[in-house]
Design a protein with these regions (language model features):
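Alpha-helical interaction segments
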Residues: 12-13, 398
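N-terminal Sec signal peptide cleavage junction
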Residues: 21-22
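Hydrophobic core
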Residues: 14-18
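Bacterial N-terminal signal peptides that target proteins for export
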Residues: 1-10
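Mature extracytoplasmic enzyme cores
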Residues: 26-414
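Enrichment for repetitive, rod-forming helical segments
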Residues: 10-11, 90
């Protein structure tokens, strides 16, 4: 997958100044932060922020401020991963994730797909959130890692995209390439809706018990939001997100649990024994599309270096080489950033029926949802962007295929 380089060889290369070295210096960031936002932030007895603004952008800016103030370390912990710079901050052992981010072309997709798919309202909210984080850094430079800043709109969009890949099971699916026979114990979260006819108190209850850590980048952050444009709610999100992912508004509450639908396939390719840059497709040898790029990393805690890597692409998808075998990855949401819009839309619904209508757009690639509205209607929805496959049963495992019939279209859903 990644060209292996010994630490000794790298140190020797530095000493004799071989070609390929790069010098990376830290500079305090210089950037402008908009003063256009009008937001007020109050806190209750428990310290929960109540964020009010004229517009959705004002509220998103406020969310960025409170995330930076209350959960700065959690907020920036995954920022190097989102940028494909994990190894540059955390050392050579972290370079695999940088390779994956580059292989999946996440940053070019943010620019060429995400910014075209998402509404201007959502893009402006993402920018406002980043502005809030950066404003905190600007006012408290001694409390932050200045090398991380400025946090950008692109960081926010890439972070959402990557988080949804992992929640949909990317890490679990990739593990199949090295441990096909291992079976993990199923785990998951809980959400329960009980109508008044089932309770002694004649009250209705919605329980949201998602099994997230109590802290860290995927630990819930509780907040209350209200904009004069009609976006309001109380619930939880993760540091790095400007939306409410679980919670309630004045009319409806909703909980989400990880359901892990089969939204990704891994294809084991047949490689030409006479040319490792070709794979079999419909009884013919097809050449990989090959790109080259540099991955930067830190060595010995202070030395900054880069290595040139090849990135292969097939008709089946981007390709990973592992132990002499070549695997292509195909994900149902590989060309979609609509999950951000999807979370925003469900948070503005007024009843279970509106919630179902928004969820039916299938902008969110996975998750179960349990809901209850103020009229005590309850709903359970198994959600997923599941492709219409040639052989769905075979797709539960790694697929050994050279047939184009197994290459599904991500616009064709079951």
């Amino acid at each position: 997958m990644i060209k292996k380089i010994s630490s000794t060889a790298l140190l020797f290369a530095v000493i004799i100044l071989m070609q390929g070295s790069c010098a990376i210096t830290n500079k305090n960031p210089t950037y402008k932060i908009s003063n256009q936002y009008n937001v007020s932030i109050d806190r209750d007895f428990w310290g929960i922020p109540y964020i009010k603004g004229n517009t959705d952008q004002d509220v998103a800016y406020g969310i960025g401020l409170v995330h930076a103030e209350d959960a700065y370390e959690d907020l920036v912990e995954l920022m190097p991963l989102y940028r494909g710079q994990n190894a540059l901050y955390n050392g050579l052992d972290s370079i695999d994730t940088d390779y994956l981010v580059r292989l999946l072309k996440i940053h070019s997709k943010v620019k060429n797909i995400g910014k075209q798919q998402l509404s201007q309202n959502i893009l402006s909210m993402a920018q406002a959130y980043a502005d809030g984080v950066n404003m905190y850094a600007n006012k408290h430079p001694d409390n932050v890692d200045l090398s991380i800043h400025p946090v950008t709109q692109e960081d926010v969009l890439a972070g959402s995209y990557i988080q949804h890949l992992f929640f949909a099971g990317l890490d679990r699916d990739l593990a199949q390439m090295t441990s096909r026979d291992e079976t993990s114990i199923p785990t998951g979260s809980n959400a329960i809706a009980i109508n008044s006819t089932k309770t002694d108190s004649n009250a209705s209850y919605l329980l949201i018990n998602s099994h997230q850590p109590l802290s860290g980048p995927v630990g819930w952050y509780e907040l209350n939001i209200e904009s004069e444009s009609g976006w309001h709610g109380h619930g939880g999100n993760f540091p790095g997100s400007f939306l409410i992912n679980v919670g309630f508004n004045k009319n409806i509450g909703w909980g989400a649990t990880v359901n892990r639908p089969d939204v990704m396939d891994i294809f084991e390719l047949t490689i030409n024994p006479d040319n490792a840059d070709q794979y079999l497709l419909d009884d013919k040898w097809e050449s990989f599309e090959i790109e080259e790029d540099k991955l930067a990393f830190k060595l010995f805690g202070f030395l900054r270096w880069s290595t040139k890597q090849k990135f292969r692409y097939s008709k089946f998808g981007p390709v990973i080489e592992m132990n002499g075998k070549y695997f292509a990855l195909r994900h149902m949401n590989q060309s979609s950033f609509n999950e951000i819009e999807g979370w925003y839309e469900i948070s503005k619904t007024r009843n279970v029926y509106e919630f179902e209508k928004q969820l039916a757009k299938r902008k969110i690639p996975s998750f179960n949802f349990v809901t209850m509205d103020s009229d005590r209607n309850i709903g359970y929805f198994y959600n997923g962007r599941i492709p219409n496959r040639n052989d769905a049963l075979k797709a539960r495992q790694i697929i050994s295929s050279s047939s184009s019939k197994d290459i599904w279209d991500e616009r064709d859903l079951v």
